[in-house]
């Protein structure tokens, strides 16, 4: 059933297999946690990941997995590698800046999620961070702050974050001056000042307000 958005956690907590376990007890084995990163960035793609963990996994196998925002880059890199070893399936999907401009950020995020899910094969149920997305079908449970509650959603957040950060940092050489090695496309003051100085690159989201303001000659630091 489509979840209505339950949950809500602020402090640093260890995600659990509570939600996955309930579905496993119903006989489902291919439960995919899905999360996205990069939704609010000014440049680069929005990226989603889908992670299917083995039924009845010992949570100690992924004991350090948290919402990606609660981990430092070396920790994220370590756990992304460990997730790849432990998971039954991992899928990564992205939607480019051009697709974001063409579709809008919501539809592009949905597209990235659909692309990630297409890589993991059969999915019996989706655990989704945030609010329900009817386009993903009826077999989903949406959890507010799900990346802090569900281990598979937290795992997806890490996989997506590491993949996107690595891409943006590699583009720092191709598109120098914007500071992507550190800001990975987000709208820091350094990035906004670089936009004033250099103008947008092909990887910038021209439909986003700061870029629209730039085209109108109004962007500021």
UniProtKB/Swiss-Prot annotation:
Pfam families reported in the protein's UniProt record: RNase_HII
GO molecular function terms noted in the UniProt entry: manganese ion binding; RNA binding; RNA-DNA hybrid ribonuclease activity
Location(s), subcellular: Cytoplasm
EC code: 3.1.26.4
Principal subcellular localization: cytoplasm
Cofactor note: Manganese or magnesium. Binds 1 divalent metal ion per monomer in the absence of substrate. May bind a second metal ion after substrate binding.
Cofactor requirements of the protein: Mn(2+); Mg(2+)
Record's keyword terms, sorted: Cytoplasm, Endonuclease, Hydrolase, Manganese, Metal-binding, Nuclease
Disordered: annotated segments: 198-221
GO cellular component: cytoplasm; ribonuclease H2 complex
Highest classification ranks of the organism: Bacteria, Bacillati, Cyanobacteriota, Cyanophyceae, Synechococcales
One GO-annotated biological process of the protein: DNA replication, removal of RNA primer
Keyword Aminoacyl-tRNA synthetase belongs to the record: no
NCBIfam families: PRK00015.1-3 (NF000595)
Record's protein name: Ribonuclease HII
């Amino acid at each position: 059933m489509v979840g209505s958005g339950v949950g809500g956690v602020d402090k640093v907590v260890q995600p659990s297999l509570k939600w996955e376990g309930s579905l496993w007890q119903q006989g489902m084995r291919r439960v995919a946690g899905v999360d996205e990163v990069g939704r609010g960035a000014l440049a680069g793609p929005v990226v989603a990941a889908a992670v299917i963990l083995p039924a009845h996994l010992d949570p100690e196998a992924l004991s350090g997995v948290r919402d990606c925002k609660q981990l430092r880059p070396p920790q994220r890199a370590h756990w992304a590698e460990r997730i790849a070893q432990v998971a039954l399936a991992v899928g990564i999907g992205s939607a480019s800046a051009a697709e974001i401009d063409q579709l809008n950020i919501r539809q592009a995020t949905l597209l990235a999620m659909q692309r990630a899910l297409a890589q993991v094969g059969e999915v019996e149920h989706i655990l989704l961070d945030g609010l329900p997305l009817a386009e993903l079908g009826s077999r989903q449970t949406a959890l507010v702050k799900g990346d802090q509650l569900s281990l598979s959603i937290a795992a997806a957040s890490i996989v997506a974050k590491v993949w996107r950060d690595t891409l943006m940092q590699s583009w720092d050489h191709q598109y120098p001056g914007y500071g992507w090695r550190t800001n990975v496309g987000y709208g820091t003051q350094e990035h906004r000042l670089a936009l004033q100085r250099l103008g947008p690159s092909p990887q910038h989201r021209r439909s986003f307000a700061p870029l629209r303001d730039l085209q109108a000659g109004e962007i500021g630091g």
